[in-house]
Amino acid sequence: MLSKTVVASEQIVLGLSQDEVAITANFDGSQILLFGAIQRDAPEPDGKMGVIITIAGPSKPIAVRKKEKRFGIWVNNQTVEVDAAPSFYAVATNAPFSEILLDVEDLRNKISIERAIRSVGAPMHIEDSQSFTEAVIRIRKDQKLYQLLENEILVDQNTLFRTAIDMPANLTEGDYFTKIFLTRDGKIVSQFDTTIDVKKVGLERFLFNLSRQNPLIYGLMSLAIAIFAGWVASSFFRYIRHT
């Protein structure tokens, strides 16, 4: 799949190894290969060139709670709502992030992990609401859901580029918006957008739909499976004891 942006002097031509990720019962992650080229109808402009690729999963609000120990018991003390937190977010670059993108461009386009999420709804008495956002970032980085991949885009002769981004097994179903930015001296001069479709298939799709559309039947089926599994295990151990 190849597409291009419409830009006067430089164009991004992009290819994907796959534009769909299927989540099956044994899904353990996937790797997306992104490759492309920068087409020019004039000599290459002056200035340091940068290539940035982002992949953002579906965004959902999150209530982040801070626990505090009172009388020997951990209780929820403060809550801040993070209203835009991608379930997955990866940023790949061909050079250190700060060297190829100005902060004002990052602020405008929300490219860095820190800019990609925002928090609202912090009560007036909470002075460090930013720490709640930082907690979300820290936790999701540990889960490999948020990734900063500096110097991971290979650029050949300032024209061809490629990179691979690992997507973990615990992906959320939905559209994953992919953006490619071309920068000069930290300013964005070209951008291309596309989408990767992540969806459950087979048994995973059937069980997911059943749990949403017929929760009672799904619950009864789960209970029946649990009872049957317990009976099988009990029968097996009785057989072992008598042999």
Describe these PLM feature segments.
Residues 9-26:
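N-terminal edge beta-strand
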Residues 38-40:
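Short solvent-exposed capping/turn motifs at the termini of beta-strands
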Residues 42-47, 171-173:
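A short beta-turn/strand-edge loop motif at beta-sheet boundaries
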Residues 69-168, 172:
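Membrane-proximal low-complexity regions enriched in glycine and acidic/polar residues
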Residues 166, 189-220:
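Short, aromatic-rich amphipathic segments at membrane interfaces
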Residues 170-200:
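Extended, hydrophilic extramembrane loops/domains of integral membrane proteins
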Residues 216-243:
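Juxtamembrane interface at the cytosolic side of transmembrane helices
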